[in-house]
Amino acid sequence: MVQVNFQVLAELDAAGRAALLRRSETDLSMFLEKVGPILEAVRTEGDAALVRFGRELDRAEGLTREGLKVTEAEFDEAFGLVEPEIVAAIRFAIGNIRTFHEEQAPEPMWLKELRPGAFAGDRFTPIRSVALYVPRGKGSFPSVTMMTSVPAVVAKVPQIAIFTPPAPDGRVDAATLVAARLAGVETVYKVGGAQAVAAAAYGTETVTPALKIVGPGSPWVVAAKRLLAGVIDPGLPAGPSESIILADETVHGGLAALDLLIEAEHGPDSSAWLVTHSRQVAEEALAALPGHWSAMTPQRVDFSQAVLCGRAGGIVLTGSAEESHAFVNDYAPEHLQILSEKPFEHLGRITEAAEVLMGPHTPITIANFCLGPNAVLPTSRGARTWGPLSVHDFLRRSSVGYVTAPAYPELAEVAKRLAEYEGFSSHANAVGPMRDAYLKR
């Protein structure tokens, strides 16, 4: 019989509470050891290593050196392989995602006159090249393609390339190609796993190297990003899926259970908790889960049961709404859904969550696919300092300053005084009489 993990927070000591905060993702130490040789092989062997690892690790026997990059014909064929209603859904989602990220995009530059004649501001320019990682291990993810591609295109990154694992026949998921083209990305490589991160970092005969890589992935991908952080910007920490459903007494526990399964079904390495101070809601959720499982595919049932019956998922019963809020902030979840008739009353208490979805009509599903905000989010408590993937992740920010001749003397005098105090003679000379002599010429 299935035994869902049920924890009463008041009954746990400090160690027990700390254990609830741990994610289910595997210890990376084992992967760090195994990934090292893969990265070195790609660096030294290039395309040959990509094909070899594609065949060995992704079982893509049909992969060839000539076929590492998706062709125009493959893009065109993809539209014939995906049902029209799915293509329409992808178009709809991309429209919302683009609108959101266009609103998010900053002006190219702003300047403010801080003192008469002294101006300073910020200037934003796109990163020269980025790699977008789209996983495939437990399913097809055109949604990840949309969420990574659209902000990069809105940011006007000149060189954008998608990396995604090939199927056994050496082909790429058709819906991923449809999403890529509709989003505005034309370069897709049939490379996944640690070897994709290495190819993006070092480049090969076929792959053009990038300055940054973004997108969620397996522990192999996470380990590779960590090892290559000095070569390529690894972006925000995006590992296995995680969520908290925060429910109060104003909703039915069956609804909370329905939404609890959204992230739990991603895979056995996901983390998913229902947090509530209402015992009735908790008991209703427990009672509803078997019925919800009966409406899922066997594989997704297995995944979600592994999560909810393991150490990284289940139900947490707290003593009060305030205690629930504190638990959420300690956990710093990737996804937070607030199930309440008055969700905004809870929102003010939440400080550490990458995504906050409010009310019974805003399930994680809608946000994952088509609401508009980005669904590539920091995991493993990354929400304590990181936010969702955004246009800003694809932009460089440079500060800009301009001082006019009338404003110069006042600023120079202050700067000279501070430079002399800190012992920097050249700093002081650059704003002293020596400069004045040159400026008078």
Swiss-Prot record:
Positions with a binding annotation for Zn(2+): H266, H427
Entry-linked PROSITE patterns: HISOL_DEHYDROGENASE
Active site residues per record: E334 (proton acceptor), H335 (proton acceptor)
Co-factor(s): Zn(2+)
GO cellular component, one term: cytosol
Cofactor note: Binds 1 zinc ion per subunit.
Record's keyword terms, sorted: Metal-binding, Oxidoreductase, Zinc
Gene Ontology terms, MF aspect: histidinol dehydrogenase activity; metal ion binding; NAD binding
InterPro entries the UniProt entry points to: Ald_DH/histidinol_DH, Histidinol_DH_CS, Histidinol_DH_monofunct, Hstdl_DH
UniProt-listed Enzyme Commission number(s): 1.1.-.-
NCBIfam families registered for this protein in UniProt: hisD
Protein name, as recorded: Histidinol dehydrogenase homolog
